[in-house]
Design a protein with these regions (language model features):
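N-terminal Rossmann-like NAD(P)+-binding subdomain of aldehyde/semialdehyde dehydrogenases
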Residues: 1-136, 321
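Short, well-ordered beta-strand elements within core beta-sheets of diverse protein domains
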Residues: 30-37, 53-57, 131-132, 152-153, ...
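Rossmann-like NAD(P) dinucleotide-binding subdomain of oxidoreductase/dehydrogenase enzymes
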Residues: 118-277, 404, 457
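Hydrophobic beta-strand-centered segment that forms part of the acyl-chain substrate-binding groove
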Residues: 572-581, 585-630
Length: 670
């Protein structure tokens, strides 16, 4: 008998006398006892705020990203222990891959994005500096900093590992401690993964805590610096969202709810063609994976009226071949629902759907003691007059075919559910894809457009990717999670800071034009990453650009554009006073002015960003460069990236060009 424990204030707490007995969905026998312990939720929040939050916020974004990478690697090394428990939830090995490997992969992804896309500091910069005064002495900048409370994560039963890790990763990267509350039915698998997290020793005390069982008065104790992220049913979300304490303190509440997701077969998809076959294959996958218990599963299959019979026959034949039984048996394609209560709920909702739709296949169950149900396909002859098919979700291996007249009608039907997490379109016609997108994008959190070109690399209709947002409008909850760094920002406060360039530079750890320049003891290209200071600047001598320079560059490169070679034609151009120097010639001369050629800590020039030209340079003009260290970002164990602001001015002091130069610089001297 499994006895998953809560983890609060650094201590494991066993189930209490009122623990709930969990009946196995496969064996129909008791497999675990969970909950019932008297947890002190006030103490848990205090522990998170006093210990976990300060420890996490003391780390830079990159340090937290490295922590996540190490944790993901630790979990990956022990994942077979989780796969051993996985069948108890009713899930097959294939189902478990989505949950276990998918969750670990999500953590790896956030670790990588944190290193690549966030600064190696404590303040996230959101957007460009805004000049608020005429002379540049008063500026504005949007920043984001971690919330100083705790994140409460209330997760669903269907993905006990992924559901936890996909919320933990962005919150911990943001620097916010978390209290995890898994669904009781599958909490033993969540607890096994959570126990590994604690055993890794990689997170600071108070960074994560676990609630097995009821949340008691936890939500009543939250404040404006806290956040709630919920995944589950629309009914439960409505109940939680209405908590008076959450409303009173405007506590952030993100909800990802079940939704009646649609898949559209394009009018160009002929029976037996690639797009038709892809539609059928993905529909079968969505109906059967996790026994249909996915918030992103296809529930409404919208097909042209002329293709309805072809699709019905193809799907019915494929679904009839699906083997249903003990998920530990590799021969079984589909396992059980997560509980007998979940199966009963599906059967109840299926009965209500049958008032508007006919059963084409399924609506039966294997002769087994567990919570099994055969995949079921319905068809609704008049989806315009129907309401249940657009409102009632049977959260299991059930989908309904809906015939449509044309593309506009298909989009109308897809939108009829009041908002969804994802809608799919199977077409090779770009015009159809654009029409459906314009008609439907506002109603769905994600549009998955599939055809023969994308299929070899596609991840599937029902797979939320950590790079992309997961959420949707209306019935889907109106929230978002994941989406790369967007998901991290849900746990941060965006603040507008205003002040002088020096103040903003100090806050953001980034040199801002107008802030103080620093003069180093020698050329910065001869100094290591650690030695270079933010704001360190050199001013180069000037170089005169001659007509011979321009003509030689034109012949040498082949760039004989008339503005460089034909004075009369150039004067007819509203941008040029006559022949002018090539922009790339100016960049080359600039490099010649500021580069220190001897071997040193600078390893490579790896990029150039935000290049712009403000004023043409004519023969006889001179240019000089101001090169300033703008920011520094650690990249590997041996070198980091230094971003330089390069500003080119002419003999009159007027700016002619500006760009950001990226160099990789060694931490130490060779």
């Amino acid at each position: 008998m499994l006895k998953p424990e809560s983890y609060a204030c650094g201590q494991w707490i066993a189930p209490g006398a009122d623990a709930q007995t969990i009946i196995g969905p496969v064996s129909a026998q008791p497999i675990a006892q969970a909950g019932g312990a008297a947890l002190d939720f006030g103490a848990m929040l205090d522990w998170a705020r006093a210990h976990g939050g300060p420890a996490l916020r003391a780390m830079t974004f990159h340090q937290r990203a490295k922590m996540l990478k190490a944790l993901a690697g630790y979990l990956d090394a022990r994942k077979e222990e989780l796969y051993a428990i996985n069948p108890l939830t009713g899930a097959t090995r294939r189902d478990g891959w989505v949950d276990i490997d998918g969750g670990i992969g999500t953590m790896f992804l956030f670790a990588a994005k944190g290193r690549r896309e966030m600064p190696d500091g404590h303040v996230y910069i959101d957007g460009e500096v805004e000049q608020l005064g005429r002379k540049g002495g008063f500026l504005g900048q949007h920043i984001a900093v971690p919330l100083q409370g705790a994140a409460v994560h209330i997760n669903a039963f269907n993905f006990p590992v992924w559901g936890m890790l996909e919320k933990l990763a962005p919150a911990l990267l943001a620097g916010v401690p978390c209290i995890v509350k898994p669904a009781t039915q599958t909490c033993y698998l969540t607890e096994a993964c959570f126990r590994m997290i604690i055993e890794s020793g990689l997170l600071p005390d108070g960074a994560v805590q676990l609630v097995i069982g009821r949340t008691g008065d936890l939500l009543d104790r939250l404040g404006a610096q806290d956040a709630v992220a919920f995944t589950g049913s629309a009914d439960t979300a409505l109940l939680l969202r209405g908590n008076q304490n959450l409303l009173r303190h405007s506590v952030r509440f993100t909800s990802e709810q079940d939704s009646l997701n649609a898949a559209i077969l394009g009018p160009d998809a002929d029976a037996g063609g690639p797009e038709f076959d892809l539609f059928v294959t993905e529909a079968v996958t969505e109906i059967t994976t996790k026994a249909g218990q996915k918030c992103t599963a296809m529930r409404r299959l919208i097909v042209p009226q002329a293709r309805l019979d072809d699709v019905a026959q193809a799907l019915s034949a494929r679904l009839a071949e699906v083997t249903v039984g003990d998920p530990a048996d590799a021969a079984m394609r589909m396992g059980a629902l997560a509980s007998h209560a979940a199966r009963d709920d599906v059967l109840d909702r299926l009965a209500r759907l049958k008032a508007e739709a006919r059963v084409l296949c399924g609506d039966t169950a294997p002769d087994l003691p567990g919570a099994f149900l055969n995949p079921t396909l319905l068809t609704c002859d008049d989806p315009d007059a129907a309401s249940a098919v657009h409102e009632i979700e049977a959260f299991g291996p059930v989908a309904t075919l809906l015939p449509c007249r044309d593309t506009a009608h298909a989009a109308q039907l897809a939108n009829a559910s009041g908002g969804s997490l994802v809608a799919s379109l199977f077409t090779k016609d770009a015009g159809v894809a654009r029409d459906v997108t314009l008609a439907s994008a506002a109603h769905h959190g994600r549009l998955y457009i599939m055809n023969r070109t994308a299929a070899p690399e596609a991840t599937g209709h029902g797979s939320p990717l950590p790079h992309m947002i997961h959420g949707g409008p209306g019935r889907a909850g109106g929230g978002e999670e994941l989406g790369g760094i967007r998901g991290v920002l849900h746990y941060m406060q965006r603040t507008a800071i205003q002040g002088s360039p020096d103040m903003l530079s100090a806050i953001t750890e980034t040199w801002i034009k107008g802030s103080a320049e620093v003069t180093g003891p020698d050329h910065p290209f001869q100094r290591t990453f650690r030695e270079i200071a933010i704001g360190e600047t050199i001013h180069t001598p000037a170089r005169t650009v001659t007509l011979e320079d321009i003509e030689h560059f034109a012949r040498f490169t082949g760039d004989t554009f008339y503005a460089h070679m034909d004075d009369e034609a150039a004067r007819a151009n509203p941008f040029f006073p006559g022949r002018v120097a090539h922009g790339y010639l100016l960049l080359s001369f600039a490099a010649g002015l500021f580069v220190q050629p001897d071997p040193g800590p600078v390893l490579a020039n790896t990029g150039l960003n935000a290049l712009s030209f403000q004023k043409p340079v004519s023969p006889g003009d001179s240019i000089a460069v101001r090169l300033t260290c703008k920011r520094k970002t650690a990249r590997t164990d041996s070198y980091g990236e230094v971003a330089w602001n390069a500003t080119l001015t002419n003999q009159e002091g007027a700016q002619v060009a500006e760009y950001e130069l990226l160099t990789m610089v060694a931490y130490d001297r060779a």
